[in-house]
UniProtKB/Swiss-Prot annotation:
Function, as annotated: Pyrroline-5-carboxylate reductase; part of the gene cluster that mediates the biosynthesis of paraherquamide, a fungal indole alkaloid that belongs to a family of natural products containing a characteristic bicyclo[2.2.2]diazaoctane core. The first steps in the biosynthesis of paraherquamide is the production of the beta-methyl-proline precursor from L-isoleucine. They require oxidation of a terminally hydroxylated L-isoleucine to the corresponding aldehyde by enzymes which have still to be identified.
Superkingdom as given in the UniProt entry: Eukaryota
Xref: Pfam families: F420_oxidored, P5CR_dimer
Protein name: Pyrroline-5-carboxylate reductase
């Protein structure tokens, strides 16, 4: 059967629905609700380790299932990995990199009655390592690095493939369309994926801390002896700062360079210039460079530890439409 076209509806499986898997599940359902027909998924099946996780996933997606445009979702225990993968056209590996060995064991007996695309979301694990571990896999193998922003359709998803499992045009289009429904897609050579991951996925945590720090600087409970009447509630400060960050990103995406943007905002002797002097004194830019470099190195190191043991246990259940 064809994997994805304008008229066919593939089955998608997410094996190991942790934080990133849940975010992707939510993003795909929201895309189906807001843009029906953009990516035509017939059915979604996810596997989890525990009844508790199954309940959390169910609660998180329940409001989205009220829309008739949203495909049905099945939440199954992880010992169903093989059966779930056999019934899928696109299989996403959402477990931790340390669970690769366990996953290989689960999938060894699966039938290869039709061609499936395998997409790994595991941090630091190259397509080559996946191909080596799943030597019995006959279809295309792709590595995807996305962030939890897939839940709101704002992720940058970085994609690469193995030389041994180069994708045909149809498979490449299917993967591109799947992730384009939850953000922006960029294909890269595998050799660049570790460094790109540092700024494409991990950086959300860094940006969040920067936004929080800026907001705290003008918030009531963090004022340095200033008149509290002049301070903002933290929630308000966070909302303002987050929107300013969004505006910054939008300008940079329209080809405004960072240096030009700084020059547009900061005037000699002005308030912004005073703040920039603090950042320069504290060596913020150098700190961020070091942060990105260390994160990239740590991502590369993950591939060395892939294949150990991983997650937990659950009960079969179908998520009903609300």
């Amino acid at each position: 059967m064809a994997l994805m076209s304008a008229v066919e509806y593939p089955n998608v499986a997410i094996l190991g629905c942790g934080k990133l898997g849940q975010a992707l599940l939510v993003g795909l359902l929201r895309s189906a609700s807001g843009h029906p027909g953009r990516v035509k998924i017939r059915e979604l099946k996810v596997t989890v380790r525990s009844a508790r996780t199954a309940q959390l996933v169910r609660e998180r997606i329940s409001p989205l299932l009220r829309d008739r445009a949203v495909p049905p979702v099945w939440i199954l225990q992880q010992d169903q990995n093989c059966n779930v993968a056999e019934q899928a056209d696109i299989v996403l590996l959402g477990c931790k990199h340390s669970s690769l060995g366990e996953l290989v064991h689960d999938l060894q007996g699966m039938r290869h009655d039709h061609r499936r695309i395998l997409i790994s979301l595991m941090g630091g694990v190259s397509p080559g390592l996946i191909v080596e571990a799943l030597h019995f896999w006959t279809g295309p193998v792709v590595r995807a690095v996305c962030s939890v922003a897939v839940a709101v359709g704002e992720s940058i998803t970085l994609l690469s493939t193995s030389d041994d499992h180069t994708n045909d045009a149809e498979s490449r289009r299917a993967v591109t369309e799947l992730f384009a429904s939850v953000g922006v897609v960029q294909w890269l050579p595998e050799c660049q994926m570790h460094v790109a991951s540092a700024v494409g996925a991990s950086s959300l945590a860094f940006f969040a801390q920067m936004i929080e720090g800026l907001a705290q600087g003008v918030a009531e409970q963090h004022s340095n002896g200033a008149n509290n009447a002049q301070q903002l509630p933290l929630e308000t400060a966070l909302a303002i700062t987050a929107q300013a960050a969004r505006g910054t990103a939008a300008l940079l995406q329209q080809s405004t360079s960072p240096a030009d943007l700084v020059a547009q905002v900061a005037t000699k002797g002005g308030a912004t210039a005073a703040g920039l002097r603090v950042l320069e004194k504290e060596k913020l830019v150098q700190t961020l460079r070091t942060c990105a470099a260390i994160t990239a190195e740590a991502t590369a190191a993950l591939s060395q530890s892939a294949g150990s043991h991983g997650e937990d246990n659950t009960t079969d259940s179908k998520t009903s439409r609300a």
